[in-house]
Design a protein with these regions (language model features):
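Structural recognition of alpha->loop->beta junctions
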Residues: 209, 403-417, 421, 468-492
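Substrate-binding cleft of extracellular glycoside hydrolase catalytic domains
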Residues: 118, 311, 317-443, 449-451
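Functionally critical loop-and-helix segments that line ligand-binding/catalytic clefts
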Residues: 273-324, 471-526
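Aromatic-lined carbohydrate-recognition surfaces of secreted/lumenal glycan-active proteins
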Residues: 452-466
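Short, T/G/N/S-enriched strand-turn elements that build extracellular solenoid repeat scaffolds
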Residues: 214-263, 267-271, 275, 279
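Sec-dependent N-terminal signal peptides
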Residues: 4-16
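Feature responds to low-complexity, polar/acidic, surface-exposed segments characteristic
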Residues: 2, 17-50, 58-111, 115-136, ...
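Extracytoplasmic/secreted proteins, especially bacterial periplasmic and envelope-associated proteins
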Residues: 48-51, 64, 79, 83, ...
Length: 526
């Protein structure tokens, strides 16, 4: 994992420049609602890093002594460990102690950084807590803490040969990504010490928001794109924030309790765990962990092409795609021969639905007209049932209803379980549990498969990743709904419903849903 260029480009460059030329912009993060208690020091009133120091001191991340901060003193390795621990909030403590540690204030932080693989010590198993941290060592610790891995890209600093072997890969990674650059005479100065003010400024510039307590955080006064946002507590609601960089959840935070309300996010979401960094996704206002056992979407979004008639194709000779529609009684009377003339290859016909309040199962009033009309026009046909099942028993009832009503029809495309949320306070499915929904989908699809048809699950990003546990339904093909020119779904899908507002001849009185399929199901023998 390598974080975005705009997160730390020119920020870690602080490491490579003298304090007189540091690119300080600490006033930007200071406008965010951190968990703070005002703190100041007597020796920073005229210092270039005053705002950054006061901000991070007020959050309790840095401290001084006897009212002084000593901003231009070198930062020790112990102090760097404590700062990183207060930001990252590691929970696991290594029982493998460095040989040079005694009972001091920094031991807990160092041992937690050791457990996280951030601080590994030297070849003699020493942490050297009282020594000044060098620029190359600071790069290594920061990179490890934030998940930036070493690379072998060739370096072009004048003093490259002076960089230690254990640091050169990290320096290479940060340089390759544009995160660091040379100072005077294009030198890296790997052995030069890092001052306390320089260290604070690095974190101040990297991290726009550092949340350590539960609560609501409204960033409405903040302008521009935020950089790094770190969330170190459960039950956090973030509002009115444009985040250009990454969101990082610290160890142990329950992602299900975080809400990103009225938040635009352009970066990635990661959580540190003892097993390493795990990726998460923003789904509406939710944060959802990535399931590493599911196949990632294999399609290139840029290759989806829509023509002047709204027909979507996929511009890759390795794939053959098929254009289709889905209809219900909402479309009224449909001229299926006109749809066939416009290139419609397949159609999903709504067979029926369960009332979202009453729970009563109904046959779609246009089902028989639509399915017979599509078949007469030579269009391949599948059916879907709009489910509001609460459990497996109701899903079985729905599947049997479908099977009873498709007898005698040539069903060559899938039979679809279409469970959706309903925007109503009285919807019977409002409080459904994931376990019940997954059991319902499996029961419906297995019943359909047992009858000799191809089962499929339909849903959008919200239902698929917030309501379902996708690994529980991955045995079935997936029909994904997202009304955009390019899909953004993280996982693979078989059919994409890309619009619910298409205009096609043959459907004069309503919009129609249109789809692109990567599978010709009529050629599959289930």
């Amino acid at each position: 994992m390598v974080f975005k260029r705009f997160l730390v480009a020119a920020l870690l460059a602080v490491l490579l420049l003298s304090s007189a030329s540091l690119p300080v912009h600490a006033d930007q993060p200071s406008s965010t609602p951190d968990n703070t208690t005002p703190v100041s020091f007597t020796d920073i009133s005229e210092h270039w890093a005053k705002d950054a120091i006061e901000r991070w001191a007020s959050m309790g991340v840095i401290v001084g002594e006897e009212g002084k901060f000593r901003p231009d003193d070198p930062l020790t390795r112990a102090e760097m460990a404590v700062i990183l621990q207060r930001i990252m909030r590691y929970q696991t403590t290594s029982t493998d102690y460095f040989m040079d540690l005694e009972e001091e204030w920094y031991v807990d932080a160092i041992q937690k950084l050791r457990a996280a693989g951030v601080m590994v010590g030297d070849e003699n198993n020493r942490a050297m807590p009282s020594e000044s941290i060098t620029r190359e060592a600071a790069v290594v610790l920061i990179a490890r803490a934030f998940g930036i891995y070493p690379t072998q890209q060739e370096l072009h600093y004048e003093d490259t040969e002076s960089i230690s072997s254990w640091a050169v890969g990290y320096v290479s990674a940060l340089s390759q990504a544009g995160y660091v650059r040379g100072g005077d005479n294009n030198c890296f100065f790997p052995a030069a010490p890092l001052t306390r003010a320089e260290a604070v400024t690095i974190f101040n510039n990297m991290i726009t928001a550092c949340i350590s307590e539960s609560g609501d955080y409204d960033y409405r006064p903040f302008e521009g794109l935020a950089d790094f946002v770190i969330i170190g507590a459960d039950n956090v609601n973030i509002l009115n924030f444009d985040i250009g960089g990454n969101i990082l959840l610290t160890e142990g935070v329950d992602a299900e309790t975080i809400r990103l309300k009225t938040v635009k996010h352009y970066g990635e979401i990661w959580q540190y765990t003892y097993d390493g960094f795990k990726q998460h996704l923003k789904v509406y206002s939710y944060i959802v962990p990535v399931n590493e056992n599911l196949p990632v979407c294999s399609y290139d979004p840029s290759l989806f092409v829509k023509d002047e008639n709204g027909i979507m194709t996929y511009d890759d000779p390795r794939y053959t795609t098929y254009f289709g529609v889905d209809v219900s009684s909402w479309q009224g009377d449909v001229d299926w021969h006109k749809l066939k003339e416009q290139g419609v290859y397949f159609a999903f016909i709504r067979l029926g639905y369960r009332g979202y309040e009453t729970g009563v199962i109904n046959l779609d009033t246009k089902f028989e007209d639509n399915i017979q009309g599509a078949l007469d026009a030579g269009i391949k046909v599948g059916v879907y049932f709009f489910s509001q099942a609460l459990d497996a028993d109701e899903a079985y009832e729905e599947a049997q209803f479908v099977l009873d009503n498709i007898k005698g029809y040539d069903i060559s495309f899938p039979v679809v379980f279409d469970w959706e949320t309903v925007s109503s306070d009285t919807a019977r499915t409002n409080n459904i549990e994931t376990e019940d929904l997954c059991q319902a989908a499996n029961t419906f699809c297995n019943t359909i498969a047992d009858a000799g048809y191809i089962p499929m699950v339909y849903c959008n990003q919200n239902v698929s990743m917030v309501y379902y546990e996708l690994s529980r339904i991955q045995a079935f093909d997936f029909w994904y709904a997202e009304y955009k020119d390019q899909p953004t779904f993280y996982y693979n899908f078989d059919i994409w419903q890309y619009s619910d507002s298409a205009k096609l001849d043959g459907v004069p009185n309503a919009n129609i849903d249109v789809n692109i399929s990567f599978v010709d199901y009529s050629r599959i023998n289930p």
